[in-house]
Regions:
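Active-site environment of divalent metal-dependent phosphoester hydrolases
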Residues: 53-55, 96-98, 128-136, 166-169, ...
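Zn-dependent metallo-beta-lactamase
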Residues: 1-43, 308-310
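A contiguous pocket-lining binding segment that forms or flanks enzyme active sites
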Residues: 139-218
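Core catalytic region of metal-dependent phosphoesterases/phosphodiesterases
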Residues: 45, 54-155
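Acidic, His/Gly-rich catalytic cores of divalent-metal-dependent hydrolytic chemistry
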Residues: 189-310
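Short, conserved loop/helix-junction motifs that constitute active-site signature segments
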Residues: 113-118, 170-173, 255-256
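Active-site-proximal beta-strand elements of phosphoester/diester hydrolases
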Residues: 43-51, 157-164, 177-179, 261-264
Length: 310
């Protein structure tokens, strides 16, 4: 891929993308302070919301479902075979258990890391389900696995964050920002009233004003200009209240010199946010305000247009 072209190449029919992290548009910056590196042009296979061990959690809730650990792992390796990338980036919620994973989930993660690091290096961007990830990696004694802070990481020209909390400023200043967490889907209705739910990509200009307002605030927990209120003592997850309109009315011009890409969930058992159903709010504290002109794409590449009007 030539510098200046789209750095995000969704893999057809798959909830994964090849991301080229080389600096673009004359921007040579590369973050090494938060686990980034300076290998410009590295191509990474990026997936979000793998949720290893999900079936364990479902069984605890009384839902009998066999483990899909081997299937998940084989799907990922098949994508590596197809894309021939040099690195895998997990865009948060690689694990499913919040906190310390149990033995079955830990074993799935260890086998996954062992098989992946025989082929590529691995970056785990911490999500809200990845609290015990450093311990898993340390106990397994596996090299070539890097776990980032929850604020995300910038690799070359691309910022990566899970999306459950506010990313670091250098992450959101990247020309392209990738997040997960939402498991975005659309509910589609056919001509006879039948309905189905499809996973999607959300892509559009990144409106940086909510991040600017947060940086400029007096750290009092309120970003009044963008209609976002963060309760004291939270990181900005599901409990955040927001106006939910995505409207630019009465606000200064958008600062949209970058792109935001919301990844579909890799694990197809986790459900998702119906982004075209007004009653379903976003989970991320900075959506939909930072993606007011976002468009939806099916996994086969079909462009659906404005996600709110699908």
């Amino acid at each position: 891929m030539a510098a200046g072209s789209d750095p995000i190449e969704p893999v057809p029919e798959a909830p994964a993308a090849v991301v080229d992290t080389r600096p673009r548009n004359g921007d040579p910056r590369c973050d090494e302070s938060r686990g980034g590196d300076s290998r410009h042009g590295e191509r990474a296979l990026v997936v979000a919301d793998y949720h290893a061990g999900l079936e364990v959690g479902l069984r605890r809730e009384g839902v009998s479902v066999p483990s899909h650990a081997a299937d998940r792992r084989e799907r990922l390796h098949a994508l590596l075979d197809e894309t021939r990338t040099e690195r895998v980036v997990f865009l948060g919620d690689l694990a499913h258990a919040i906190g310390d994973p149990g033995e079955e989930e830990r074993k799935e993660l260890e086998i996954l890391f062992e098989t992946l690091t025989e082929r590529v290096s691995v970056v785990v961007v911490k999500g809200n389900h990845d609290g015990g990830m450093e311990e898993v990696v340390e106990r397994a004694g596996i090299e070539d696995v890097r776990v980032t802070p929850t604020e995300g990481v910038r690799l070359g020209a691309v910022g990566f964050a899970h999306g459950h909390t506010w990313p670091a400023s250098d992450v959101v200043e990247a020309p392209t920002v990738c997040i997960g967490h939402e498991h975005p889907t659309v509910r589609l209705t056919d001509s006879v009233g039948g309905q189905r739910v499809e996973p999607i990509w959300l892509r559009g200009p990144l409106d940086r004003r909510p991040f600017d307002a947060r940086s400029d605030s007096d750290d009092d927990g309120v970003d009044a200009e963008v209609g976002i209120t963060e309760p004291s003592g939270t990181e900005g997850g599901d409990d955040v209240e927001r106006d939910g309109t995505g409207s630019n009315s009465g606000r200064e011009p958008a600062r949209t010199d970058g792109e935001l890409v919301v990844f579909p969930a890799f694990n197809d058992l986790v459900g998702g946010t119906w982004v075209n159903v007004p009653e379903q709010g976003f989970l991320s504290p900075f959506l939909p305000e930072t993606l007011s002109d976002g468009e939806a794409y099916l996994l086969d590449g079909t462009r659906l247009g404005d996600y709110r009007r699908v």
